Amino acid sequence: MFGGRQSNNKSNDSLEQLINRATDETLTNDNWQYILDVCDNISSNPEEGTKQGIKVVSSRLASKDANIILRTLSLLVAMAENCGSRMRQEIATTSFVQESLLKKFTDRRLHKTVKFRVAEVIKQLHDSFKTDPSLKPMTDAYNRLVNDYSQYSAETADGPAKPAKKERSRQDKKKEEDELQRVLKLSLQEYEREQTVKKSYLNNKPLPQAQNESQYQEQPRQQQQQQQVLQNQPMHSTPTGQQSTQSPAESQTIATVSKVRALYDLISYEPDELSFRKGDIITVIESVYRDWWRGSLVNGKTGIFPLNYVTPVVTKTPQELSRELDEENRLLAVDSKRIDKLLALLSSNPETINEDEITRLYGDIIPLRTSLGKFIDKYNVRKEELSVLNSQLNNEVKLYNDLMDSSISQRVTHQPSGMSMAPYPTGVASPTHSSFSQANPSMLHQQPTSSGFGNARGNSSNEYFHSQQVPPTSFNQQSQPHSQPQPPQQSGPQRHNTEFSNINNFPNVNNI
């Protein structure tokens, strides 16, 4: 009798240890091996294990550690699916549902991620228990979740359903093209108007006056002239009654949107779809389907994404950009000195610390955390964008160099052998020519021979050689500069390689 009670205590202790191991706060993900060990232990002794398991699970759900609660919720679902009807009866009790599950939604100190997970578990248990009328408390808990805590339901936590990929019709493509052309035309008209106003103002600009009163009187007249020019400037291509301004709904097209921000997480396993996280900025490239656009993330990944998962990024006005730049300069010039001063005071001797000054500096610095974090995120994204652009540019330059190298190698490989092996013919047999041709074979290799040896008219083929010829060193250096030129020696045509069929067509030297 006492031995049986001791064995039950050991089994209870081992079950509690297994549950604590499966719901340990150091686990970053659900360990299903530990969870299945708990289920096997309860199934081996359902009478004692069920009550003991629910008791330990309830105590773990009452913990303040969010990680323990998340791991325990996963264990609860596994116990409901694998430990039989007794476990389901214990889970679907009013006390357990009310104290361990529904009460989490009213806890303000609990993170919303845990509340979303509790709502997901309630829905999952409701779908599993709804066929059994004896498990009605779980159905009641789900109805209360939908009615009172709808903000935590699974439909709200997840993103909307992705639209179907429908090919765009010709009308849609034509409409998009017309919209793009209209936006470009309006932009061009606005630019022309600005140039016309600027030109008109410069033409009508009065000469500077010496007196201040005349200058003050001239300024209102100039403003009236500018307003009159603006009012009289026609909009030639805009039909009557059509306004250049667009409603926000009409302006959100591929022609006007350049960047969008993700509203939800999207993890896709399709090769052509883009996966992203909530808050990511996507650069729009083109419209692929009716409700799908193609875009790229900051890290360079490219793919298509549904439009109901994103919202357009509003372009900042020049005033906002100027205000943001002023805030950055103030943060770097003034506030950074306060931070350095506070760090210096905190690292100094504690006996000489002025508590009032530290408190004042701390109170001035704490509100800067939001702005500082925003600027850090901004420049972090900018740095990542520039890194991706740099890597893409390096890849393109490398590809271009490879193509150029392959093109040059192919050109050298396919060059005719006659062009590379042909010696440059001449009728004058001089040592200078022979030594130059032996010392500079590459020069002769590059000489064009498009018209063939002996077939060229005129001296165009010989002019290149004489322009590149090195001055001879074997001549008498003491010869008179105005001496009469010696007549060339007569010599017959020299025989060269019989590879060239027209090598014997060269005329004699006297006939050149």
From Swiss-Prot:
Keywords: Endosome, Membrane, Protein transport, SH3 domain, Transport
Keyword Protein transport: yes
Main location: membrane
Domain of life according to the entry: Eukaryota
Function: Component of the ESCRT-0 complex which is the sorting receptor for ubiquitinated cargo proteins at the multivesicular body (MVB).
GO cellular component annotations of the record: endosome membrane; ESCRT-0 complex; vacuolar membrane
Family: Belongs to the STAM family.
The keyword Iron-sulfur is assigned to this record: no
Assembly and oligomerization: Component of the ESCRT-0 complex composed of HSE1 and VPS27.
Topology of this chain in the membrane: Peripheral membrane protein
Entries under SMART domains matching the protein: SH3 (SM00326), VHS (SM00288)
All residue ranges annotated as the SH3 domain in the record: 255-315
Region (Disordered): 153-180, 200-253, 411-512
Taxonomic source organism: Debaryomyces hansenii (strain ATCC 36239 / CBS 767 / BCRC 21394 / JCM 1990 / NBRC 0083 / IGC 2968) (Yeast)
UniProt-recorded name of the protein: Class E vacuolar protein-sorting machinery protein HSE1
